[in-house]
Amino acid sequence: MGIGSRSSMMLAGALALGLSIPSLAADRQMERLTRGVAVTNVGSGVLVSWRLLGTDSPDTEFNLYRDGEKVASIGKTDGTNYLDASGTTTSKYTVAAVVNGKEGAKEGVSVVLDKTVSNSGKSFPYKTLKLEVPAAQTMPDGEKCTYTPNDMSTADLDGDGEYELILKWDPSNAHDNSQTGYTGTVFIDAYKLDGTRLWRIDLGKNIRAGAHYTQFQVFDYDGDGKAEMIVKTADGTIDGTGKAIGDKSKDYRDASGTILKGPEYLTVFRGVDGAAISTVTYEPSRDINQHVKGKDAHGYWGDNYGNRCERYLAATGYLDGVHPSAIFVRGYYSSSYVAAYDFDGKDLKLRWLHKSEYPGQGLYGEGNHSLQAVDLDGDGYDEIFFGAAALNHDGTLRYRTGLGHGDAHHIGDLDPDLPGLELWDVHEHTDAQYTEEMRAHDGKIIWGTPQPSSGGVDNGRGMAADVDSEYRGYEMWSAKGGGMKTAKGKLIGTPAVSQNFRIYFDGDEYDELLDGAYVTKFNSSSKKSEVYFDGPAALGATGCNGTKNTPSLVADLFGDWREELVVRSEKDPTLLYIVSTPVESKLRVYTLMHDATYRTAVASQNTAYNQPSHLGYYLPDMVKSLKQPAVVMAGEELAPPDTTPVVNNGKSELDASKPKEGDGFTESTNEGFLENGYFNFANSLSSYGTWEIFSQKEAKTTLTIRFTNGGTGDRNMSLNVNGKSAGTISFPSTGDWTKYSDATIDVKLEAGVNTLKFSSMTSDGGPNFDMFTFGIDGVELYDGTQTIDTSTTIATFVPFKTGVMFNPATGMLFTPKAGFAEVYFYDMAGNMRMGVSRNVPAGSTPMALDRDMLPKGMYVVKVKVDGKLMHAARMVK
């Protein structure tokens, strides 16, 4: 979506109705987690902590039991942790939520950190995982390589509500893309927190090892409660069940050890066993001449040895505002390609492909060694941060700054007094205007440090974190930026602070700094960093990725909101450490993993030059007024699979040459059309067409589209019917613009007015549309005069079993218990058009609604009780 379009419309509507402004974001699909009760050894007793889940009311109380006896009651504003001086790691703890004085089910322990190490005056709890190291390998040139643990991710792979760890093994001969040489095989393992290995995937000899090659995304993409892994594969990749992808006999390595030939794939692996589910061709291939006609042998990559074409990035984001999509990138030094994919449980489908192939345009040359999908402007859809440029959720260009490539970025509510999220970026190009800069959600530079007048510098490190309690907002600094600055750009000083990672590791609302396994705390009074945890000295732990010295993973894996540090042993590759906070916290904070900004950042943390995760809100403000996140658990409160039978017992033919609106034009230049011409979509990724049609009845039927495509390639389009995705349609080449063909897709029509929106998925735009044919009678183009027999048609489309019902025709709400009720009406574009809220008793209550204020059309009605979505229905007025 373009900047501000949805948010401005919804804001105006809310103000006109005199309502407080609700969140623009829809409820986002998240993992269904347990309480994650953690019992950790802190020397003098145990620290017990647990999650405040995104589905909990902010003032949920808790009872804590040890060996069946209650040892603590946790109040409405207390932190979800308790230091039990009399407890041990073998004690049996349970936690129960208490809502309105009623205790719920007790949940047991998820993880025990039974070990402790004394360091810097505190006892740090930790546990170790024993890993199965891949065997050493010998390369074709006789060189040998060994393995150490490298980057990691986390997700619930088996649906038990607990996180598993996904680990990439790094061979000792891994190479940068600019270097020649053979590399060992890349392996990816999955482990449960008790050390059980679930599977190992062997990416094979045709995938090279190095920081810029294998970017793996692990997330529950299909919403079945079990995560999948998506990663680039090739001939010879062996899945977790031992089955090969492609031809495992093929070896595409050349004499220098590089790989510039052979098919390239993108594969979805099942989380529970590592089985390959769906494999598609990686888009685009490394041969840029298939996409752009180069001026010489180098084409537009800028080299012919695989440096620029073999640089990959990956991220996960909510491109439709509700469900996660996977995003994969090829190239950022020159030509740049971004492909977004959706997974429906069976097939991996391309949502869109963005191409930036010409210098000075789009994403060309603007990429970082990192990628992040995040809702920058609060419109409910995730944008894609690329570096010095960004894309909108639909793959169109959001902005280009022209500042070029960079090595580090940070995104969060860096300045809580500004709208949206802000970005901190450092730049490698010595001719860039700034060496470091803070950027607004729309790409405008808020402030920056200009390059020195004596000559530009290559700024390779940068950090943003909220470390100084004296100043509101984050602090920012970089390797060559001249010191630490506030969110307003004020120079604080030049303290000796690390420029690597951040972590919540103590009990306050401010960041600690992390360099490998070394944690420091910034002293706001002395303006100096103080050692908080010396992991190398205490445990012999270390980071990975050479001089980058990043942790394998930092994430809120269990317990309360504090983060866990996952690092490897420097000397023993079989040993992995999970270290947690040593102290209590009075702060009540929702599990960080139910904040979408943070959760997707954890998913992309392993990408290339690992970047730390930040929250989508300003924590010091949040702890003062805790707000429940807008989330829905995977598999819960979502529309079920549509089993409506397809009806094709009639025929309705419609002229498709004139949509209600669109990016294109109606013409009759080329022969072969049947009625008044055809609609010619613009040749761009942003082209679309919207048609309003009227149906006399509700039915699921087949839509046949008569089209012509005189181009050389497929022109795929996505179809949304009444604001809901109906799928993707392939429009292959017909060979000539006067030759027509048919494409079909099943659509579900409501009785009354329906909106069909076709959106292009390639930069070539769409084909030419001539006719629509529906498989039922009584369908026609809507001209504003047709009406349906009844004034209101209601079709419940979310199978809630809550007992809450709302009748839009009468305004009557029924709730089985008393509570605070909210009723909102949304149009099919997602804009809130009307709303009302009040405290209601159990039983039937009239809600004061003036339906006459709504124009004719279709609406989604959502009902929340005590902050939870309890009922949803469609209404046609």
Residue ranges, per PLM feature:
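Solvent-exposed loop/turn segments flanking beta-strands in beta-repeat/beta-sandwich domains
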Residues: L53-Y65, F820-A821
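C-terminal tail/sorting-segment detector
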Residues: A795, G835-S837, A848, D852-K877
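Beta-propeller-forming repeat regions
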Residues: M30-T34, L52, T77-T643, V721
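Surface-exposed, proline-anchored Ser/Thr-rich loop/turn motifs
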Residues: I788-A818, F825-R833, P855-K856, R874-K877
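Surface-exposed, short loops/turns at beta-strand junctions within beta-sandwich domains
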Residues: A85-T90, K748-E750, R851-K856
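Extracytoplasmic
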Residues: V186, Y191, A639-D789
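Structural beta-strand segments of beta-rich domains
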Residues: R35, S44-V48, G689, T701-L703, ...
